[in-house]
Amino acid sequence: MKLKKILLPAALLILAIGALAAYLVRGGFRQFEITPYPVPPPAFTNWNDVLAHPRDISWTTLRTGVIRMDACLNLDPASPRQADCDHAPRDLAALVHWVHHPRFGDFLVDAGFDDSFAKHPPYGNYTEAMQLFNWANGVTNRQEPGEDLAAQLARLHVHPNAVFFTHFHPDHTAGVPALGRETEFVFGKAEASFLARAAVSGHFSGKSKFFSIDFSAAPAMAPLGPSVDVFGDGSFWAISAPGHTDDDIAFLINATTPVLLTGDASHFAWAFQSGVAPRGWNSAGTARGYVSLEQLRAFARAYPSVKIIYGHEAGI
């Protein structure tokens, strides 16, 4: 455990130095031209009413590859429950959720991996800084042929109009190069930070349609935090869940079988059930992560009929 406590700060330093080097060598990261996402008035103002009115919307979860690591490294290092966490390397799924709406068509939540992870294992299309970060933490990635995002979408005959991101970490954005130039990318307003761009900006090369969700004026819908009715019809909700990153988003799909996608507000079931928040960039982020996690846990207790899919564990 002592070695791990040393390695992670060192890896974070490597990531920061790598990001700065890339910034200087490449003349700076291109600035995303970001348009505020047009948020319509909500169809409902409480979750009882939302869930009492399921919508004609469907979802399918896809695994686009596997991340093998000590999953406990993703969690609050100061938590006393770390001693109970199984630190043996395990497989975490790189998940994408395909959602179909009768009016707004097909879209994704997160982008997973493109086929570079099968062609160039174990780091695929990650930046040099992220490859060093993975190596320092003993993280490897793998993918079976045909498991990549583009291959699965082709088999499903799906052409997504947009991707809604839980957050800007590369294991959630590495499938973006496989998507068309006209695809829209939607994320929390604070996600386009320097460090986020350092980790993922290469994935968005040639893309131009960026939209940010601003939760500052969104109503809190107890027991969750600020929540946005994305299409204004009660079918698809973006829920502010910061901590792991500054503007992490969870999503609720209000289908006949409703599902809450926690994103990396909770990476896997043990952490959710044990009340251990994800690690943030700093202690303040981790503290915010506990607030978000407890809101999600309270929602799960209040609405046990809602299926929970974690950031890297879906039971598929």
Positions of PLM-derived features:
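Metallo-beta-lactamase
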Residues: 3-158, 188-240, 259-263, 284-305
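Active-site environment of divalent metal-dependent phosphoester hydrolases
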Residues: 70, 168-174, 193-194, 245-249, ...
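Active-site beta-strand termini and strand-to-loop segments that position acidic
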Residues: 99-103, 232-233, 252-256
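Active-site neighborhood of phospho(di)ester-bond hydrolases with catalytic His/Asp-centered motifs
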Residues: 108-110, 159-167, 187-188, 240-243, ...
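Cap/insert and terminal regions of metallo-dependent hydrolase folds
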Residues: 129-154, 256-316
